[in-house]
Amino acid sequence: MARTVVLITGCSSGIGLHLAVRLASDPSQSFKVYATLRDLKTQGRLWEAARALACPPGSLETLQLDVRDSKSVAAARERVTEGRVDVLVCNAGLGLLGPLEALGEDAVASVLDVNVVGTVRMLQAFLPDMKRRGSGRVLVTGSVGGLMGLPFNDVYCASKFALEGLCESLAVLLLPFGVHLSLIECGPVHTAFMEKVLGSPEEVLDRTDIHTFHRFYQYLAHSKQVFREAAQNPEEVAEVFLTALRAPKPTLRYFTTERFLPLLRMRLDDPSGSNYVTAMHREVFGDVPAKAEAGAEAGGGAGPGAEDEAGRGAVGDPELGDPPAAPQ
């Protein structure tokens, strides 16, 4: 029986690494996994994990693939010896944290290129063959930051919101082609993601006003607390990917945690967005500015009990490690 061929981007660490070895070591021995990395010099941890799980010979291969480079994507596709990819996992991503005015133009461009355009490049490379064959699955690493805005994650959230629109639009089209696309919506995850977050807190004060600077460090403290309380292990998240992969009738979205669903329901229940904005501000910063309170009284803002509905500690950065320490 032919094995299911899976290609995963972003496998040097975190979710990509753990998903790759989870599939390669599956007792069914039904998967052939191509774990791709931007730099093959970083594959050591992947192979250590593969040995620890006793992945059978031939179940796992590594390929160089940089989602920022169409030629690199095409070259990786050509090195898949089976001549097809049954399951494509778009997992590579970058983060960017800080006040918007403090972010460099190159850093902003990098996040959008990797998170959005990089995913488009992968889909352009692999979807046509899936459509021709009338079968295939695409799993995209989504985020609660793609479903609700998080302060100081403006560009990161913008990139993940873009993925939501991209994937939802494609899912509508792909129904008659026999190709299923699912977003795996992650909350905080114990990974090295923060090491890849572009932007240094030490540079923030020179690029923003003192009030925003103060709010930024309020956010960092809050984020660290949420991470301690709510972060999942990548192994746990990998199981959600496996659930989506094996589902007879996959849905568009799978959530790795239910912790953020009350806030998401709040957004849906109030299309104006006022309730969510006020509740999120209160949740992160512990206060509601007078202007926001006045707006709520005028009609539609978050009233008493909105904080309880959202749930304390229900806000955090998707796939973030401990926030950087405040400069001394």
Curated annotation (Swiss-Prot):
Subunit notes for this chain? Homodimer. Exists predominantly as a homodimer but also exits as monomer.
Molecular function via GO:
17-beta-hydroxysteroid dehydrogenase (NADP+) activity; catalytic activity; estradiol 17-beta-dehydrogenase [NAD(P)+] activity; estradiol binding; NADP binding; NADP+ binding; protein homodimerization activity; small molecule binding
Q: Which Pfam families match?
A: adh_short
For this protein, the record's SUPFAM superfamilies field holds: NAD(P)-binding Rossmann-fold domains
- Give a short account of what the protein does: Favors the reduction of estrogens and androgens. Converts estrone (E1) to a more potent estrogen, 17beta-estradiol (E2). Also has 20-alpha-HSD activity. Uses preferentially NADH.
Family as reported in the entry's similarity comment: Belongs to the short-chain dehydrogenases/reductases (SDR) family.
On this chain, the residues bearing Phosphoserine are: S135
Q: In which pathway does it act?
A: Steroid biosynthesis; estrogen biosynthesis
Single GO cellular component term: cytoplasm
Record protein name field: 17-beta-hydroxysteroid dehydrogenase type 1
Give the taxonomic lineage as stored in the record: Eukaryota, Metazoa, Chordata, Craniata, Vertebrata
Which residues, if any, are the signal sequence?
Answer: none
Q: What is its main location?
A: cytoplasm
Q: Where in the cell is it found?
A: Cytoplasm
Q: Which reaction does it catalyse?
A: 17beta-estradiol + NAD(+) = estrone + NADH + H(+); 17beta-estradiol + NADP(+) = estrone + NADPH + H(+); testosterone + NADP(+) = androst-4-ene-3,17-dione + NADPH + H(+)
Gene Ontology biological-process entries: adipose tissue development; bone development; cellular response to metal ion; estrogen biosynthetic process; estrogen metabolic process; gene expression; lysosome organization; skeletal muscle tissue development
| Residues that, per the record, bind NADP(+) | 10-38, 66, 160
